[in-house]
Amino acid sequence: PERLFDTRPGTPASGHKGKLGPGEAIDVEVLGHAGVPTTGVSAVVINLTGTEADAPGFLTAYPTGQSLPLASNVNLSDPGTTAPNLAIVPLGPDGAITVYSSHGTHALGDVTGYITDSTAPVSVEGLFVPIAPERVFDTRDAGGPVAPDGTIDQAIAGTGHIPAGAVGVVLNVTGVDAPSPGFLTAWPTGTAPPLASTLNFWSTPTDTRANAAMLPVGTDGKISFYVLAGGHVLADATGYYIGPEGL
C-alpha cells in the first residue's frame, strides 16, 4: 500500500491540504503516482478514509470528468469519526479520480493496486481467482493478542484454499478488542512498513472494526500486520491472484 493523498496539513502526501467543506470535491491525480503506471490503467484500488468529520456524512470517489453518482464509498456516522473502506474506482480521461465530501472532513487514500486496460498484454499473471470466504488466521485461537505498537507475520499463501504460488490475496481484515483508538496496517512481509492504514479504531475501548484489503504476499507467502493500540486480529480470505508462472 502507498499513500496517494492526504488532506491533513503537515502530512507528506502531495495534493490538496485542508478539510473538504460540505459539498466540496477535489481531483486526485492517479496515473504515475503511488506505484500506478503512467499508462495502461483503467481503475485504481484504493483504501479511502474519512477522518475528523465535522458531522455525519459520506465520501464518494468517481472518475474525474463525470457527474457525481448516487453512491457512497465511506460513511461517517458521528462527529470526529474515522472510517475507511476499500474501493475500485475507474479513472477519468486525464487519469484522475474525484473525491466528494457531503460534510466537512479530512480525506486520505492509500493505493493497494490497479486494474489494467485493454492495451495490457494478455497474461495469466494477475488473474483473480475467487474462493468461498474462509478464515486464514485468528489470534484469539492461537498466539494471543498483538501487543501495542506490535507486528505479527502471518503465513497466507499455502493456507486453506490459497495456493503456495499465489502472489496476492483479498482479505477481510478485522481488529477486535482494541484497547484505545488507533489503526492497523497490513503489508507484504519482508518489505518496509508503508505510510498507510488498512483499518481504523476510533471510538471506544474493545472497538471491533473490519475492512477489505487487496495485498501482495511477501517473504514465504506471509503478510505483516501492525497494530498501534494492540488487540486481536483475524482475517478471512475471499480470493487470490495468480503469479507469472500460473498455478
Q: Which positions does each model-derived feature cover?
A:
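Short edge beta-strands and adjacent beta->alpha junctions
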Residues: 1-247
